[in-house]
Amino acid sequence: MAQLMNKAKNFVAEKVANVEKPKASVEDVDLKDVGRHGITYLTRICVENPYSASIPVGEIKYTLKSAGRVIVSGNIPDPGSLKGNDKTMLEPAIKVPHSALVSLIKDIGADMDIDYVLELGLVVDLPVIGNFTIPLSHKGEMKLPGLSDIF
């Protein structure tokens, strides 16, 4: 009886592991807004849903790092859902306080940019499987706004 149960568990685990899952990629990270409290960057994430039904996105977890240090991290609850058999563009905004950027002053240099790594976890609710996190990572260079951008 125990062998039969183990075979059944292995069969189900194998089928679940081979279920097609949504695919995602970071398309772009751009400066969106400069305010008194910080800078807002707009992240564009393209997600492809292989299912005919729409899939809800529970949250987007993010961590923005530079020079091996975390600049900002957080989560964006309920950013929407993924259209069935289609690509959906999600555009979460990431707010970075000025104080976090000041701590990176030695990395900025003369060209006013920061090398960064953006780590994202896109949490989708798949039928039968439950919550599934799609891990994403994007490396790039952030241009900091000049005084003319602020005033």
Swiss-Prot record:
Instruction: Name its GO BP terms in alphabetical order.
Output: cellular response to desiccation; cellular response to salt
What InterPro entries does UniProt report for this protein, alphabetically?
A: Lea14-like, LEA_2, WHy-dom
Say if the entry is tagged with keyword ATP-binding: no
* Keyword annotations of the record: Stress response
One Pfam family of this protein, by short name? LEA_2
Zinc among keywords: no
**Record's note on what induces expression:** By desiccation (leaves) and by abscisic acid (ABA) (leaves and callus).
According to its record, what are the GO cellular component terms? Answer: cytosol
Q: Give the UniProt family note.
A: Belongs to the LEA type 2 family.
* Identification of the protein by name: Desiccation-related protein PCC27-45
Q: Which organism does this sequence originate in?
A: Craterostigma plantagineum
